[in-house]
């Protein structure tokens, strides 16, 4: 029966270090796109809900990822990523 190899490959960074680095990257990106008061309020909400726990960190990461994804998908003014806004004919003449 096959067994998984033990400790082969490069050593992985500890989960908590990786998580905190990811959170810092997301926060620095979010500050470029959203008002600081919104982000501060989000942080306060997370802190009130989860306290100072890893669950709160994970929740904040998840929410920031979702906010940034939607922001870019809708069409950030600073980015080329997103939906291109096109004018549509009202009579449907552009449909094939």
Swiss-Prot record:
Say yes or no: keyword Membrane present.
no
Q: What compartments host this protein? A: Virion; Host nucleus; Host extracellular space
What ranges does the record give for the region Homooligomerization, renumbered to this chain? 1-42
Q: Mind telling me how this protein is modified after translation?
A: Phosphorylated on several residues by host. These phosphorylations regulate VPR activity for the nuclear import of the HIV-1 pre-integration complex.
Please name the GO terms of the biological process aspect recorded for this protein, alphabetically.
DNA-templated transcription; monoatomic ion transmembrane transport; protein homooligomerization; regulation of DNA-templated transcription; symbiont entry into host cell; symbiont-mediated activation of host apoptosis; symbiont-mediated arrest of host cell cycle during G2/M transition; viral penetration into host nucleus
* Keywords in alphabetical order: Activator, AIDS, Apoptosis, Cell cycle, Host G2/M cell cycle arrest by virus, Host nucleus, Host-virus interaction, Ion channel, Ion transport, Modulation of host cell cycle by virus, Phosphoprotein, Transcription, Transcription regulation, Transport, Viral penetration into host nucleus, Virion, Virus entry into host cell
**Positions bearing Phosphoserine:** 79, 94, 96
The record's listing under Gene3D superfamilies reads: 6.10.210.10, VpR/VpX protein, C-terminal domain (1.20.5.90)
- Keyword Ion transport present in the record's keywords: the answer is yes
* Coiled-coil positions: none
So what family is this one in? Belongs to the HIV-1 VPR protein family.
Remarks, miscellaneous: HIV-1 lineages are divided in three main groups, M (for Major), O (for Outlier), and N (for New, or Non-M, Non-O). The vast majority of strains found worldwide belong to the group M. Group O seems to be endemic to and largely confined to Cameroon and neighboring countries in West Central Africa, where these viruses represent a small minority of HIV-1 strains. The group N is represented by a limited number of isolates from Cameroonian persons. The group M is further subdivided in 9 clades or subtypes (A to D, F to H, J and K).
Function, in words:
During virus replication, may deplete host UNG protein, and incude G2-M cell cycle arrest. Acts by targeting specific host proteins for degradation by the 26S proteasome, through association with the cellular CUL4A-DDB1 E3 ligase complex by direct interaction with host VPRPB/DCAF-1. Cell cycle arrest reportedly occurs within hours of infection and is not blocked by antiviral agents, suggesting that it is initiated by the VPR carried into the virion. Additionally, VPR induces apoptosis in a cell cycle dependent manner suggesting that these two effects are mechanistically linked. During virus entry, plays a role in the transport of the viral pre-integration (PIC) complex to the host nucleus. This function is crucial for viral infection of non-dividing macrophages. May act directly at the nuclear pore complex, by binding nucleoporins phenylalanine-glycine (FG)-repeat regions.
Subunit structure of this chain's protein: Homooligomer, may form homodimer. Interacts with p6-gag region of the Pr55 Gag precursor protein through a (Leu-X-X)4 motif near the C-terminus of the P6gag protein. Interacts with host UNG. May interact with host RAD23A/HHR23A. Interacts with host VPRBP/DCAF1, leading to hijack the CUL4A-RBX1-DDB1-DCAF1/VPRBP complex, mediating ubiquitination of host proteins such as TERT and ZGPAT and arrest of the cell cycle in G2 phase.
Q: What protein am I looking at?
A: Protein Vpr
Q: Which species is this UniProt entry from?
A: Human immunodeficiency virus type 1 group M subtype B (isolate SF33)
């Amino acid at each position: 029966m096959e067994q998984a190899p033990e400790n082969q490959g490069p050593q992985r960074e500890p989960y908590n270090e990786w998580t905190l680095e990811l959170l810092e990257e997301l926060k620095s990106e979010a500050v470029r796109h959203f008002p600081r008061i919104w982000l501060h309020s989000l942080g306060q909400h997370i802190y009130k809900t989860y306290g100072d726990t890893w669950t709160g960190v994970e929740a904040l990461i998840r929410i920031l990822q979702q906010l940034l994804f939607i922001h870019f998908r809708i069409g950030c003014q600073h980015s080329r990523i997103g939906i291109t806004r096109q004018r549509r004919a009202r009579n449907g003449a552009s449909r094939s």
